Design a protein with these regions (language model features):
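Beta-strand elements of repeat-based all-beta scaffolds
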Residues: 1-5, 9-26, 30-47, 51-78, ...
C-alpha cells in the first residue's frame, strides 16, 4: 500500500499474508520493520534509525498449569538493552511494571477496575468507583484529589479539583456543550 502527502512524497506500507504491518518506508528512504510470532503478536520492531526493540511474551506451562499472564507481554527490551518487565495477577490483569531498579504495582477491585498504582515507597494514586464502574474520585499520595459526578446516563456532569468545579452539559448528540 502506498500513500502520498500533499507535497507528492510517498510512504509505503507492507503487510504479511495475515494482515500484520511488516514495514513502513518513509519518503526519505528510511524504513521501519516489524516481525510477528505465529499468534500475530509483535515480537520485534526496528525504527527508522535502526534501533531494535524486542517484545517477549509469557508462554504456557508445559504441564498445563495456569500461568499468570499467559500469552501476555512479559518484557520489552530496548535497543540500549534496557528492559521493562510486566507481571500479571491470576485474572490476567497487569500487577507490576519494572524498569531498572524501579517497580510500579497495580491493584484492582472485584470488578477489575484499577484502584491503586504505587511505587515501592507507596507513593501513587488511588481511584474510587461507584457500583456502575464510574470513577468517583482520584487521590494522589501528595494529597491532590479530583471528584466526579454523573447523570443517570453515566455521563460526567462535574469534575472538582481542589476548590474548582467544572460543570458539563450535553446536547442531544451527546456532545459536551
Amino acid at each position: 500500500y502506498r500513500e502520498w502527502d500533499g507535497e507528492g512524497r510517498m510512504t509505503g506500507y507492507c503487510y504479511d499474508e495475515r494482515g500484520n504491518l511488516t514495514s513502513v518506508i518513509h519518503p526519505d528512504g528510511t524504513e521501519e520493520t516489524r516481525a510477528y510470532d505465529e499468534e500475530d503478536r509483535l515480537i520485534t520492531e526496528t525504527d527508522a534509525l535502526g534501533n531494535r526493540r524486542v517484545l517477549v511474551y509469557h508462554e504456557p506451562s508445559q504441564d498445563g498449569t495456569p500461568v499468570n499472564g499467559e500469552g501476555q507481554l512479559s518484557a520489552v527490551i530496548e535497543a540500549d538493552d534496557r528492559a521493562t518487565f510486566f507481571e500479571y495477577d491470576t485474572h490476567g490483569l497487569l500487577s507490576s511494571v519494572s524498569l531498572d531498579d524501579r517497580t510500579v504495582h497495580l491493584e484492582y477491585n472485584e470488578q477489575n477496575n484499577l484502584v491503586s498504582v504505587k511505587n515501592e515507597k507507596g507513593v501513587g494514586t488511588r481511584w474510587n468507583y461507584d457500583h456502575k464502574g464510574n470513577v468517583l474520585s482520584v487521590l494522589t499520595s501528595a494529597g491532590a484529589k479530583q471528584t466526579f459526578r454523573y447523570d443517570r446516563l453515566n455521563r460526567v456532569t462535574s469534575i472538582t479539583t481542589g476548590k474548582r468545579t467544572t460543570n458539563l452539559r450535553y446536547n442531544s448528540y451527546e456532545d459536551v456543550v
